[in-house]
Amino acid sequence: MSGVWVFKNGVIRLVENPNQSGGDTNSRRKVMVYLPTGEVISSYSTLEQILRSLGWERYFGGGDTDLLQFHKRSSIDLISLPKDFTKFSSVYMYDIVVKNPNYFHVRDSN
């Protein structure tokens, strides 16, 4: 993960590739790969099918309508993702990788 930590209005956040111009936005973009098939995750429908096969279920009790959430009955883990797939950044990808070791990998898109 590369970027700059920004502190603004009492909140600290990581801004990935802050000096990157708009012309070459995909050169450093990350993708998540499902290792058993080598498939790049390109939509939430694909991701949800895979997560379900790994024992994850949709969680509707969070109250936040801007999030897709998944939980696993056998653990206390919760995966929270933005509903808009275009906002599915490497932070969310790594969260999934950590909670599903040996099934996913994050790499550069190129």
Swiss-Prot record:
Transmembrane segments: none
One GO term (biological process): regulation of flower development
Intrachain disulfide bonds: none
Domain of life: Eukaryota
Role: Modulates the competence to flowering of apical meristems.
PANTHER family listed in its UniProt record: FLOWERING-PROMOTING FACTOR 1-LIKE PROTEIN 1
Family listed: Belongs to the FPF1 family.
Protein name: Flowering-promoting factor 1
Species this protein is from: Sinapis alba (White mustard)
Lineage of the species this protein comes from: Eukaryota, Viridiplantae, Streptophyta, Embryophyta, Tracheophyta
